[in-house]
Swiss-Prot record:
Name of this protein: Integration host factor subunit alpha
Disulfide bonds: none
GO biological process: DNA recombination; positive regulation of metabolic process; regulation of DNA-templated transcription; regulation of translation
Function as written in the Swiss-Prot or TrEMBL entry: This protein is one of the two subunits of integration host factor, a specific DNA-binding protein that functions in genetic recombination as well as in transcriptional and translational control.
HAMAP family referenced in this protein's UniProt entry, alphabetically: IHF_alpha
Keyword Transcription: yes
Cited NCBIfam families: himA, PRK00285.1
Molecular function GO terms recorded: DNA binding; structural constituent of chromatin
Assembly with partners or alone: Heterodimer of an alpha and a beta chain.
Gene encoding the protein: ihfA
Record PANTHER family: DNA-BINDING PROTEIN HU, INTEGRATION HOST FACTOR SUBUNIT ALPHA
Length: 101
């Protein structure tokens, strides 16, 4: 397993090599796609990318938590969280890549 993290610049470079756009056009394309995903999530909409997965918004209700060090009860406010659910295709691809190692 690699310690390398895929970055926005890596994505832009890959688009540059695979598609043949200029480096600037590739960076702009990646930025545009990520902005569209972010904007839709911020607007409360889920995002589904076929064969990759879905970004879903879930509302969590408020509850009472406990500080593990002191044992004091602490209220935790209701909040909206972002959840990623990988597609079956992605799960199988990751599983097959791990079994090859």
């Amino acid at each position: 397993m690699s310690d390398k993290t895929l970055t926005r610049a890596d994505l832009a470079e890959s688009v540059y090599r695979e598609v043949g756009l200029s480096r600037q056009e590739s960076a702009d394309l990646v930025q545009s796609v990520l902005a569209m995903v972010s904007d839709n999530l911020a607007a409360g909409q889920s995002v589904k990318l076929s064969s990759f997965g879905s970004f879903l918004l879930r509302d969590k209700r408020g509850r009472v938590g406990r500080n593990p060090k002191t044992g004091v009860e602490v209220p935790i406010d209701a909040r909206r969280v972002l959840v990623f659910k990988p597609s079956q295709v992605l799960k199988e691809r990751v599983d097959s890549a791990l079994s090859k190692d």
